[in-house]
Amino acid sequence: MSASLTTFEPDESVTEITDTLKTDGGVILRGLAPAGLLDSVYQEVQENVPEAAQQSSTPLWPEGNRTVGALAAASSTFAEELLIHPKVLEIADAILLPKRTMASQRIDEGSNASKEDRATDGAGLWAVSENKQKSTQLVWKASDPERGPNCDHYNLGASVMLEVRECNENQVLHRENGIYQPYIGYIPKMREFVLSVMWAATDFTKENGATRLVPESHTWSEDRIAEESEIAQAVMSKGSAVMWLSRTLHGAGKSRLAERRTGLFHSFIPDWLRQEENQYLSIPPEIAERLSDKAKQVIGYSSSNALGWVKGRAKDNLLVAGSGAPI
């Protein structure tokens, strides 16, 4: 008997979803967006990205498959309706534990914070100590990785259309945190630092290469190899989404059909990690400024009090003037 993933309906509680996500390493959210919306995104991508630019020939995505990066630039519908989908952001808030929650907080809250407000940022996690000569030193302690905060906010790691075509083999199983290894190794009970989402822009079936995931593999040792009986496939209808954690083994399936299997992938990472895809070249200011403030913030056009700031620019929207810099 093969492994399986738990499927949730869109109106089920975030707590139930995230509890299962933490236990199993992956979940499916059925019918999270209208199927027609996914068709609109695909049409925008095809209109804005030439066929030649969609070709792929890499070990991860071999010749015959299709890929398109910078989805938020290729499709404003993707940026506004999928990337910042409220349910997805609620789950990301619960998994990545940001200080500034992204689903509920107004984008401009804190933008005009005073110096005194900024001086208390992270209160309880730091103190100013003095030596005998009255020189002062800032001393930090780590936050609880299970309670947070684990970052100020989170950003888009990468956004890519991943299309499986006929005649390729199963993609090698891999973990999303592999892009940061060996620099960030596996530590038991470490902070979660990548959350991935794959939207089904077509139906995902076993025959057309539905994403393969290994439940509970996020708890395994690095050298444990998954048996076929331990691998589940994210079989789901168009408009559904599968989400998984940084250490969950996964990979595209093999398609035995002539039809395309199109997924729209994006990941979220803490603001203190380097983004996998360079968002500022992929989605430059002249494109980003046409998007909503929340989309801009998730893409990366925002800063914390310590990271990513630009003097003279607003921390919650770096494309406009403001006073968000610490100096």
Task: Show where each model-derived region lies.
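Short hydrophobic-aromatic micro-motifs
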Residues: 29, 197, 242-244
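Aromatic-acidic/polar surface patches that form glycan- and anion
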Residues: 34, 80-85, 190, 228, ...
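Non-heme Fe(II)-dependent double-stranded beta-helix
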Residues: 2-23, 30-179
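A structural signal for short, well-ordered beta-strand segments
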Residues: 158-161, 197-199, 264-268
